[in-house]
């Protein structure tokens, strides 16, 4: 009887051992379960995390297109206003407006050409007001620009007085030494101008003076030194 019980116990033990996973160490099943839990948590976090869409890139194109459309509309409205204003102008105003637009176009063309050639302008503004010279070359450019500007008024009767008034105001802030240097420069210019003006007119002469020494043939004695003068009158008439 005891043998039967022992045999039955061994049989049950074998069945239980066969069902167990002999390749697993103790606690490995718990690790597998834990790893599975972590994987599930990561998948849930990925699902719960907000999807990062390329919304800035997608929205940038429509936004840029809308801005371009708006700018184009504003340009059209501005052109329409300018056309209406131009139509309401007098012929003189229209001519002045055309000249202004032409000047702006020329300035833009010049600016484009300078940028193409890599030429850096002396200033960021336009015209004399935009010039801010610091070097000798830049001051020379400023002087030329002012000279060209004033050249438009040379024919005016007030031009001479304007220059005198301008010089007084400009030289008032200079020292006496600098004024003397400027005066020397003007004096030299005056002399050069005077030479040019005199060269255009024939010189007038009232008479020619001739001095000579006469010698008697065969002798070394000087008889006399005399002077003959030819003037506007005749010597014979004077003798008579």
UniProtKB/Swiss-Prot annotation:
Biased composition (Basic and acidic residues): 46-56, 72-81
Subcellular location, record wording: Cytoplasm
Region entry Disordered, spans: 19-95
UniProt KW keywords: Coiled coil, Cytoplasm, Initiation factor, Protein biosynthesis
Primary location: cytoplasm
Compositionally skewed regions (Acidic residues) per UniProt: 28-45
Coiled-coil residue spans: 63-90, 176-235
Chain segments annotated as transmembrane: none
Cellular component, GO, one term: eukaryotic translation initiation factor 3 complex
Recorded GO MF terms: translation initiation factor activity
Subunit structure: Component of the eukaryotic translation initiation factor 3 (eIF-3) complex.
Family the UniProt entry places it in: Belongs to the eIF-3 subunit J family.
Task of the protein: Component of the eukaryotic translation initiation factor 3 (eIF-3) complex, which is involved in protein synthesis of a specialized repertoire of mRNAs and, together with other initiation factors, stimulates binding of mRNA and methionyl-tRNAi to the 40S ribosome. The eIF-3 complex specifically targets and initiates translation of a subset of mRNAs involved in cell proliferation.
Name of the protein this chain belongs to: Eukaryotic translation initiation factor 3 subunit J
Native source organism of the sequence: Anopheles gambiae (African malaria mosquito)
Upper taxonomic lineage: Eukaryota, Metazoa, Ecdysozoa, Arthropoda, Hexapoda
